[in-house]
Amino acid sequence: MTKYSELVTYTESIHMFGVRFLPCGLSCFTNLPLHEFVNSRVSTNEMKAVFDDTFIEKLGEQKHVTDRIRVVEEYLLAYLARHYQPADSHVAMAVNMINHSKGKRSVRSLMDDVCLCQRHFERKFKHYTGFTPKEYSRIVKFKNAVELLRTTTSANLLTTAVDAGYY
């Protein structure tokens, strides 16, 4: 499992406020390779291409969390309307296939379905998601295993592990 990246802004009234994007979500806002953000804390000051000073000031003026959420949503939607950069369709399709298979799908079968060679596929996937296809599949598989453990009443952990794709 990996740690998540944090996008952080500091003002007098806000100590930390975070936004979590779906895979390929942040790549719609920036051309930066997302693997550079994995396991790191990123300040809004380092993302001047997306977040300007007016955003930080307006966010700091809000007293309630719901108002801050509204400001973030409005700002990101307005930015997206002006600067939309669609994620690579091959990568988006591969992410959907991994999610649908709950991480059990092999990287080879993903490459065959998206019609890319291994090196190019892995490079694009890592650029748009921050992870290699194998790393992302492992994360999805682990999340599925946790969900199975939470919802399954069976005392047999081996069966649960096999159902989650660990064999």
Q: Locations of the language-model features?
A:
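Short, basic, alpha-helical segments at the C-terminal edge of helix-turn-helix-like DNA-binding modules
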Residues: 137-147
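A secondary-structure capping/hinge motif
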Residues: 125-131
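Alpha-helical bundle regulatory/interaction domains
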Residues: 1-102, 106-108, 113-118, 132, ...
